[in-house]
């Protein structure tokens, strides 16, 4: 439960129709198995103690009593387990029979939720046996306990206040206004569905979309426990399709036609953060709800869910290709609109032979293609300086030739040396003045050429550099339109690789692949004696894949340093140890706060993803905020 994670499961135990004792034994085994795996919530199928397909036997008192006896068995088992179990059974209340889900927790029946929507079409005949859930909540006597009975029950964990549980049953999800919507608005972050959904062609995909879609709309965790193979009888076949989703993402599911358990962890801190940042999410309104507290032991949850080390980059190759193409299209469309709006005949860009300027150039030629303008209207300027290597310069020249843009070469060496004389700086002192003078000279050259050409300067800096402040103020920090400003470095690599993989020109692909293999560097310090790059960015500020990971979890979900560290240790296990991660995490927070003043005056640029640092949109932070709280937390983690 530390860091907001709660391990949960949805399962389809083996079942025999109308054999309540057998069903209870199998469910009890599943409870033991679930608890042994460290889970604190188990959701079982609809009418799982009797079987959903009992038909008119459901009206038989013998079967109803058998269900109560089975419930007592599970209740006794629950007394010894740190586990909340939700199981389905028919229950007679005040002369009416209800299709119910009982919530069991350590020997207590916390509540009983009756089904609201009873399907009575096609193969379903529930209205033949059951009564829809009554309005309001009442108290019933059940197995010697006084138990809340109603749909509007909210089960709240004392030790983890963000963990609030509510229940609906099968068809309740499939209707126009599911009860789970009301439950989520009342504050529920985890929604459980006891279901008996028979299998027909195409239904599995539809069911999956319902579960993931509802979890996305409600910014919630959603557990769907489906009736398994034992329910298959007469005209219906059941597959036991168990699903667990979190905010639109499917975290776990079972294969069809198995009696398996889906098990994973939900991050209720993340869900709560998502609701807080979405200001259109209603204020929790639990009026009319019965709030039922329960307790769980506080312990660290062993995570089995995948922690993506590259959260900005889709892991699936097909999705990644589609994402890359969509991003390139968005970047190009943003620049196209800017050029069209100001009637600008030319775009000017500094081309270094590095990743960022390569991506910006690829975007710029797309924008010109969209405008129906010749690519020669794109003026790419290579500006060799004291640290420029033959490799990067050659790559820049070949790239421009293959893309058909106008290439200009302006050496900045003489101008910078004159500037050093003017300000009294010794050229042998390769300090920050030495470096930044070159960056600002390059920007001045670009701005002046843009004036000559009646054009605008296209910025190349990426999101990762902006987060770390790894840009010279009023140097590469500045442009008229920054196309890469919301693209993190890890994603820049994949975008350039996508361009290489999909282009028809072998020579162009070859130069793009070589650019991908070139170390990231601003090339502001003299090269090594053998002509290779001496100044390597990741040696100085740390691996970009780590910083992008930190950035994503800090900005997107507001994770504190200790949680980011925990997630990073899992995501990068075997690649970076705790000491290295802590070192660069400290660097990240220190630089992120110190360098906000640069982000407070960024040029325009297209928003591409959910994490961006534009001061006019997604990130509004004072330039002089203290980082003491965050660094102090990191000190405590040594």
Regions found by a protein language model. Give the residues of each.
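ATP/NTP-dependent adenylation/nucleotidyl-transfer catalytic domains that generate, transfer
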Residues: 6, 18, 23, 163, ...
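Enzyme catalytic cores with a strong preference for nitrogen-chemistry domains
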Residues: 1-350, 366-375, 402, 407
